[in-house]
């Protein structure tokens, strides 16, 4: 199991990055909440990882904080929630936001995330409720400030942001509408993704 990587970021294409660790480039999928805190291409970063082994692929998921990875692992234990859906959940809301949604049984908030229907949302509430007691006092859910968002090398931030939303499970037409609503001159793809996800909840 690969639990942690430290190296130089050589590619960033939301929601994927490539990190060079002593000459080996690891492709890593990250939730957008972690992607926002990545430093610039060429700089060093440390990410916590979870390896998913399938018949057709080995997928490496990365997280800026340990508590993000812990929630990811709890999510994929839930019946009907695979790694890609867990990634979409963590892209749409922070760990503490998700914990609050579960503890307060905010079904509507959960069903706004692509791939989560009413049944899956109800299952999440049943299986995870009670696991987040005292989240405000817990270091596990401590909010961490994120570094300033930096531009990825892209020709069109709006197209890149749209593609990232599609990769997270949104339909192309919905992704285009979401980006169109928040698009503004000078915005980076990461800023557009963040604003689009925030507006969708």
Curated annotation (Swiss-Prot):
Matching InterPro entries: DNA_helicase_Holl-junc_RuvA_I, Hlx-hairpin-Hlx_DNA-bd_motif, NA-bd_OB-fold, RuvA, RuvA_2-like, RuvA_C, RuvA_C_sf
Subcellular location: Cytoplasm
Sequence segments annotated as region (Flexible linker): 144-154
A Pfam family hit: RuvA_N
GO molecular function: ATP binding; four-way junction DNA binding; four-way junction helicase activity
Xref: SMART domains: HhH1 (SM00278)
Protein name: Holliday junction branch migration complex subunit RuvA
């Amino acid at each position: 199991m690969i639990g942690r990587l430290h190296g130089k970021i050589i590619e960033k294409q939301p929601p994927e990055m490539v990190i060079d660790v002593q000459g080996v480039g690891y492709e890593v999928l990250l939730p957008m909440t972690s992607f926002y805190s990545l430093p610039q291409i060429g700089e060093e970063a440390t990410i916590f990882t979870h390896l998913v082994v399938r018949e057709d692929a080995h997928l490496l998921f990365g997280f800026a904080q340990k508590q993000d990875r812990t929630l990811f692992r709890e999510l994929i234990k839930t019946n009907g929630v695979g790694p890609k859906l867990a990634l979409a959940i963590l892209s749409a809301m922070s760990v503490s936001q998700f914990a609050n949604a579960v503890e307060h049984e905010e079904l509507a908030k959960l069903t706004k995330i692509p791939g989560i229907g009413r049944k899956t949302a109800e299952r999440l509430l049943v299986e995870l409720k009670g696991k987040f007691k005292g989240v405000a006092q817990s270091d596990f859910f401590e909010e961490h400030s994120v570094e300033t968002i930096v531009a990825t090398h892209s020709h069109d931030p709006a197209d890149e942001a749209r593609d990232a939303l599609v990769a997270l499970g949104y339909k192309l037409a919905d992704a285009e509408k979401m980006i169109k609503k928040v698009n503004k001159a000078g915005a980076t793809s990461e800023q557009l993704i963040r604003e689009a996800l925030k507006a969708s909840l």
